[in-house]
């Protein structure tokens, strides 16, 4: 680094040209915006982030989802016969909900694996198995290691993450961004609900390639479009929720 310029070299002192990735985040996104803490702000951002998660991804005419970032041909998607979700913490719980949706709607068996345990077994990857790595940051160490183990065994690995240009986004064969914006609060809120929304889209896409009718696909799209508004209505009951919390927050059990 000099006063006028900078250069990047490898460990062997070979100069390289960096790939510059522009991040579409503004300063407002990392400020509390009048809320007492980031967690509350991020809870109230959910109607907006849920809309962002489905923006441009719903195809009402065909009753399906549009997820070109998966980088898979129609035939590849049609021949998926097993899905593995690799995740940790909150992302693992999102995977559990995704498991229910995909198995019920698309009839594809799904396994949700703790990433920290997956690579210490001898996981069996067969033809037709697709692995999804789910991580808000895209940098979760255990998920990255498990994902690389799956790739080593020949799996097609896709990512579901939030941070553009993160390690998972770069190292996977394709994927879907959740578009939740920066999440500062330690307890995940908007990233979790956006992950579930994206998993709903994946479920819809796979189901329409199998046994879900056009009519049912359009119904699902209508329900997905209504979710942000319903979340908004629930958040408007903040004062009622506070009153109930005041009644019960000192209780030891229910």
Feature roles, as predicted:
Residues 2-48, 55-60, 64-66, 174-178, ...:
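Terminal amphipathic helices with adjacent charged low-complexity linkers/tails
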Residues 37-39, 81-89, 249-254:
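Glycine-rich phosphate/diphosphate-binding loops and the adjacent beta-loop-alpha structural elements
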Residues 63-69, 111-117, 157-158, 236-239:
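Short gly/ser/thr-rich secondary-structure transition/capping motifs
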Residues 226-243:
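Accessory alpha-helical/coil subdomains and C-terminal extensions
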Residues 78-212, 218, 222-226:
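Glycine-rich phosphate-binding loops that contact phosphosugars or nucleotide phosphates
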Residues 53, 65-82, 124-126, 243-252:
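Glycine-rich phosphate/diphosphate-binding loops that line cofactor/substrate pockets in enzymes
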Residues 39, 69-74, 87, 120-122, ...:
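Generic recognition of flexible, low-complexity loop/linker segments
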Residues 35-39, 49-50, 89-98:
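Conserved phosphate/anionic-ligand binding catalytic regions in large, soluble enzymes, centered on
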